[in-house]
Amino acid sequence: MAASEPAANTVDHAGVFSSETGHRYEVVDSDIAFIGRIISVRRDAVRMPDGGVSQRDVIVHPGAVGVVALDEADRVVMVYQYRHPVRRPLWELPAGILDVPGEPPVEAAARELAEEANLTAGRWDLLVDVLASPGMTNEAYRVFLARDLATIPLSDQHVRVHEEADMQIARVDLDKAVGQILDGAITNAMAVVGLLAAATARLNGFTRLRPVDAPWPDRPRSVG
């Protein structure tokens, strides 16, 4: 079934969301329940279309970027690092949060590629935009396709600390990486989405990719 055109939904300055069907969702009260180093938790009271008010807890996240770095041999660059919430290392894309004020997402992606994989890229395209888990968080991430890769000289490479100190870097054939997704060996959400998007885009020669500065309406704008 073909996807329909997006509905003509609006959000006014008072925080009232109105859908084209006439349903309204109004935030009547809001407070910050928790502030952490990266995330915060906002507690909203939302008036529903039936007039009732329900509480919604929202994990507020600054947003993130990831990179599918594809070399001339059709291999993707993967990093293997420890993730404490799941208490194990995962195979992932080079990625990071949008934590530098005013930094364009593609520049953040280039920075992460340099810091985590010791690489630069001569060509960048926008691969896919994702809402991580919209039932509980505003976290959104943008995944770029990077090509024409070059290695950063050893003297200029980033010194990694914390979870990144023992990070492993590997290049994996894109088709093999897709197989590892289906086998359950790659489970990181951004990696799954990015790799499958890259494999799909490759089918038509990467001709349908958007420019790196394409509009990103779902990008988080604040931490509270």
Identify the meaning behind each predicted range.
Residues 2-22, 52, 89, 126, ...:
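Nudix hydrolase/Nudix homology domain
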Residues 3-9, 24, 66-111, 153, ...:
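Conserved Nudix-box catalytic region and its N-terminal flanking loop in Nudix hydrolases
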Residues 25, 29-68, 72-73:
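Acidic, metal-coordinating catalytic segment for phosphate/diphosphate chemistry
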Residues 26, 120-127:
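A short coil-to-beta-strand element that immediately follows conserved catalytic motifs
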Residues 29-32, 128-133:
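Short, solvent-exposed loop/turn elements at beta->coil junctions and helix N-caps
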Residues 40-44, 89, 140-142, 168:
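Short beta-strand micro-motifs in enzyme catalytic cores
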Residues 45-50, 133-154:
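Active-site-adjacent beta-strand/loop module that shapes the phosphate/pyrophosphate-binding cleft
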